[in-house]
Structure formats: C-alpha cells, structure tokens
C-alpha cells in the first residue's frame, strides 16, 4: 500500500511539473510577431528566433527584476506595452528609442534625467548586470520588449496606462 502511495505521489508530481513548464516562448513567435519597428521613421526589422531567444535571456537577466511581464514594479502606471512606449516622450516604441532610453533614461515625459535612480549603461553601479552590455545586447533586449506584446500566449505590460 505504501509503495502504491509513493508511486502515485511521484507520478502526480511529475505530471504537475510537466504542466508548469512552459515551452520557450521565442520559438512560438511567427515572423509577423518578430517584426518590430526599428526607428521613429517606421523602418522595420524581423528578428531571428536566435535573436529573440538571446533578447529574452538578456531581458530576464538584466531587466526582469523590475519589469517582469512588462510591468514596471516601481510605477505600475507605466508599463512596457506598445501603447505606453508610444506615448512616452520621446517615443520608445522602436528599437532605437529603447536603446537610447537604456543608455540615457528620462521620465515618461522626457523632462527629467533619471540616470541617478534608473539602471543604465552609464551608471552600472545601480545594476551591475548592465556593466558589460553592448549595443548589440541592448538591441536584442529592445527587440524582445517590442515583440512580446505580439505574443499570442500572454499579456505584456498591461499596467495602468491612462488616456
């Protein structure tokens, strides 16, 4: 009887773990989902599956502490949804805009420099993980952020964005 109980418990745990483990979401993105705006002029790029996976890994390592799921923990009013990024000043709904923001962060309205309090590549003492990020790394992170709202599996950045 005890042996049956142990076997059932092990089987239950095994199958429960299978349900909890998600497949790699970058692989689920089709070409349309991987097409993101590159600059304010509207040029677009299609990121490869490999770039999408790299961007996801870098985002999880350096940004997800505060932006898990595209929500901003320190200010839930402003997330990383395309709508919120588009309304920022200057707009951050493109790769070039996000790279500029990651290097030189400003408030949502673009009025105040927040390098002293927001992680960036200039002041890596705030978040040491950003110390060695290259422009290619920042581009991969930006592409990941911009492709996530197009993912059919999950919501991204659905914080409180006021009209």
From Swiss-Prot:
Subunit structure of this entry?
A: PSII is composed of 1 copy each of membrane proteins PsbA, PsbB, PsbC, PsbD, PsbE, PsbF, PsbH, PsbI, PsbJ, PsbK, PsbL, PsbM, PsbT, PsbX, PsbY, PsbZ, Psb30/Ycf12, peripheral proteins PsbO, CyanoQ (PsbQ), PsbU, PsbV and a large number of cofactors. It forms dimeric complexes.
User: Which superkingdom, per the lineage?
Assistant: Bacteria
The record's listing under InterPro entries reads:
Cyt_c-like_dom, Cyt_c-like_dom_sf, Cytochrom_C550, PsbV_cyt_c550, PsbV_cyt_c550-like
Instruction: Name it.
Output: Photosystem II extrinsic protein V
Which source organism does the UniProt entry give?
Aphanothece halophytica
Q: What does this protein do?
A: One of the extrinsic, lumenal subunits of photosystem II (PSII). PSII is a light-driven water plastoquinone oxidoreductase, using light energy to abstract electrons from H(2)O, generating a proton gradient subsequently used for ATP formation. The extrinsic proteins stabilize the structure of photosystem II oxygen-evolving complex (OEC), the ion environment of oxygen evolution and protect the OEC against heat-induced inactivation. Low-potential cytochrome c that plays a role in the OEC of PSII.
For the biological process aspect of GO, one term held by this record is: respiratory electron transport chain
- Which HAMAP family does its entry note? PSII_Cyt550
């Amino acid at each position: 009887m005890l042996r049956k109980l142990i076997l059932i418990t092990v089987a239950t745990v095994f199958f429960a773990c299978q349900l909890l483990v998600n497949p790699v979401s970058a692989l689920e993105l089709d070409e349309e989902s991987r097409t993101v705006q590159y600059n304010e002029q509207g040029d677009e790029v299609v990121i490869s599956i490999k770039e999408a996976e790299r961007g996801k890994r870098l985002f999880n390592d350096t940004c997800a502490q505060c932006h898990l799921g595209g929500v901003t923990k320190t200010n839930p009013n402003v997330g990383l949804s395309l709508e919120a990024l588009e309304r920022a000043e200057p707009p951050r709904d493109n790769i070039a805009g996000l790279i500029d923001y990651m290097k030189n962060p400003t408030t949502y309205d673009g009025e105040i420099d927040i390098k002293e309090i927001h992680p960036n590549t200039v002041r890596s003492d705030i978040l040491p993980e950003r110390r060695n990020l290259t422009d290619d790394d920042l581009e991969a992170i930006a592409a990941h952020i911009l492709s996530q709202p197009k993912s059919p599996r999950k919501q991204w950045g659905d914080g409180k964005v006021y009209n």
